[in-house]
Amino acid sequence: MRQAAPPAARMRMDAKVISKAKLPSRHVTVGPARAPHRSYLYAMGLSAAEIAQPLVGVASCWNEAAPCNISLMRQAQVVKKGVAAANGTPREFCTITVTDGIAMGHQGMKSSLVSREVIADSVELTMRGHCYDALVGLAGCDKSLPGMMMAMVRLNVPSIFIYGGSILPGSYRGRQITVQDVFEAVGQHSVGTIGDAELLEIEQAACPSAGSCGAQFTANTMATVAEAIGLALPYSCGAPAPYEMRDRFNFASGEKIMELIAKNIRPRDIITLKALENAATVVSATGGSTNAALHLPAIAHEAGIKFDLFDVARIFEKTPYIADLKPGGKYVAKDMFEAGGIPLLMKTLLDHGYLHGDCLTVTGRTLAENMEHVAWNEHQDVVRPANRPITQTGGVVGLKGNLAPEGAIVKVAGMTELKFSGPARCFDSEEECFEAVTQRNYREGEVLVIRYEGPRGGPGMREMLSTTAALYGQGMGGKVALITDGRFSGATRGFCIGHVGPEAAVGGPIGLIRDGDVISIDAVNGTIEVALSDSELAARAKTWKARTTDYQSGAIWKYAQTVGSARDGAVTHPGGAKETHCYADI
């Protein structure tokens, strides 16, 4: 026979009871008709008191594919303790993730962006199916961060995001290195600059711990976004994965989620147009990944807010570049955390008018209130004051022109030349271009065009890090340009333009250009043009024929049927604007 809840459990419940009258979990825990449902919960060792408490989903992207996510399950246990300490009942589950570092440079990368949607969808379905009342989501690698945040906004139950933390930098012959150095070493190896032994030494030194790629690549960019947009507790996204102090943030997040339930503070109270502008600001200020221009519109879409690539680019235009972070700069995420963390960056941006201070956050306070006690650290040079930036305009720039009517994006952090013009050399897949690069079958001054790699045409909008890193390793990173309707890794550097839209697969201009057409890129004025008249482009469009891909079934085929333009975030469903009811209000 089941025993009544012990006195200690009853005392915890009596301390602060949250009514389930309007919470989703009432559908599985309250009333005689739910006796079978409660029976399942008893089977897992829950007490009557625990069943009567709010049920909090604790979702992680844990797997053994890569170091990015390997610590998430351990961290989730601490979150659960925080939930329980605050009179909630945590229910842990995992979702999938595809790690770009493993998927890079081959067909596996077609799964990467697709996984963002699968993560959001799977978290939604798990929460819906079990009627959980709130969500604490832990994520590590690139697409898992936006995927988890998209799920939070879509479900609109009280939610807190936790980043698993960055990897520690490796050490190679007295200097810090990251996985970016390994990719570039492959290019050096291909031209004989380094030998097999040195390549092996670099690959074995670059990644010494658990955690996501250590520089301001996509994962750390989106982690910075999570704090700036208000979904993560201050400082929580900066502490590296191996640091035991992460448990303070994990426990606090578990406690705080119960406060958000009590106050009914939801993600769509936090994710406003102003909050999205704050997120775009920190991306540009840190020279962050161009992938943010894909993920921010997707997060906005879940809230029913129109915030596309051009809106992101508008913020980029007026934001100073102030964080000296790799790949364009000198430092890694660990260095910024030890200098003062993401709040140090946000404080100087706020003080100089670049952030909206009145945005609500998961602390229950506004961004400005969170920053009240953040003091400037004069004894560091990782983050510059916003009035004394590295460059006056942001580290990422939006482009538009007859080659990209729906826009394109380029990271200019660390670049000295912001204009480029040259003849096109066209490739219809990344593999074709990578082979040409490794064989040195290209010329200085050319614009390498990789097309049919967009969201629909790839399918999956692959990243091109293997190709760009090989160019850099060959010493050609600043001597050629590369444009694509696909994406670039946050680790990419050089004159590399991604997200060109419309993509080739739907008849966009990038699919019409030919070898030798002169392409001009101007990252100062934000233009990208091909020297062809409108009539010539129209004539070529008449002879263009759509292509089929190798994916005629399965998850990637299904993705290609529904995915939209990169301009709007490459989303696959109508979004919050078309919603007729919200899960949180079932």
From Swiss-Prot:
Pathway listed: Amino-acid biosynthesis; L-isoleucine biosynthesis; L-isoleucine from 2-oxobutanoate: step 3/4; Amino-acid biosynthesis; L-valine biosynthesis; L-valine from pyruvate: step 3/4
GO BP annotations of the record are: isoleucine biosynthetic process; L-valine biosynthetic process
Amino acids binding [2Fe-2S] cluster: 68, 141, 213
Cofactor(s) this protein requires: [2Fe-2S] cluster; Mg(2+)
Q: How is the cofactor bound?
A: Binds 1 [2Fe-2S] cluster per subunit. This cluster acts as a Lewis acid cofactor.
NCBIfam families documented for this protein = ilvD (TIGR00110), PRK00911.1 (NF002068)
Q: Which family does it belong to?
A: Belongs to the IlvD/Edd family.
Task: Specify the protein name.
Answer: Dihydroxy-acid dehydratase 2
